[in-house]
């Protein structure tokens, strides 16, 4: 694609040739009535979304670097943002895939019909594999209708106030499309108070959104004052979160960006820990219900010690920390993936089956695969 995520994951080893899919940039089929899209891997996300919006549809991904990110790169890195709350991860909307095997042969799975589940496991396998099992060439996604109305409620305050509110909202009948906890530094960068902030977005027909916002306000305890973002403020707020975590072009070559995966019950703990390790400076956003988040460390805080301390706590909570972006010198020191599970033999067996000669993205995945 456009190489926006070539620096993600482990450092490539024994690299002889870089193959680009940037010129595989055509939309093959947009079945408006079926709400599916088939496109080549090099199609860029932002202009595609504009094209789909003409038909009141959209692809439910909000990846890093959307103005440059391609569909193939999004799938290869399983990269999506706050929309995961409502629509799931990349693999949940992928219904068909074509890829080039290590021997140059074309392989396919799934199809262009939402109900078609053939090759379901293979599509999940390719999602997030960082190109180590095949070169993605074409993809088919399910699409969703653009909602009539969108509103965002932001609540700022201490973690002690937000923690019980998050638990209450999680048990409530509310159906937000995004539900994120932001670190104080990230909140401040967005023009909010330099406190922990809970951002909740609702999208539906106008009466439905109004009702949900009103229900939410009845659940908010006295010390917290909701801020309601409407219209343009709502539309720009969420892209600003991604732009703060993944500035384009990058403003700091020494920054470290990591991905967290936690139980939802540890979301508040993770950002409290981050605040102790890097007070007032680390940018962090964690999705409240999936427990997946992103942290950006800059300047003197972008150190191996801070990353390892945060990773240690994540593992204590039953989660993980993966280094996405970091200077090469630090990646040579850090264990990028920090994987401590028991599935490595299975991953090695899959690599042996799909790429026995280690030709595809060697060294970028878990365990140096």
State the predicted function of each range.
Residues 2, 9-16, 22, 66, ...:
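Conserved glycine-rich FAD pyrophosphate-binding loop
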Residues 16-18, 35-37, 57-60, 74, ...:
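Structural motif
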Residues 20-67, 75, 79-112, 117, ...:
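N-terminal glycine-rich flavin-associated loop
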Residues 37-38, 151-155, 196-208, 256-262, ...:
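Short cationic amphipathic helices and targeting signals
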Residues 76, 95-250:
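C-terminal substrate-binding/cap subdomain adjacent to the FAD-binding core in PCMH-type
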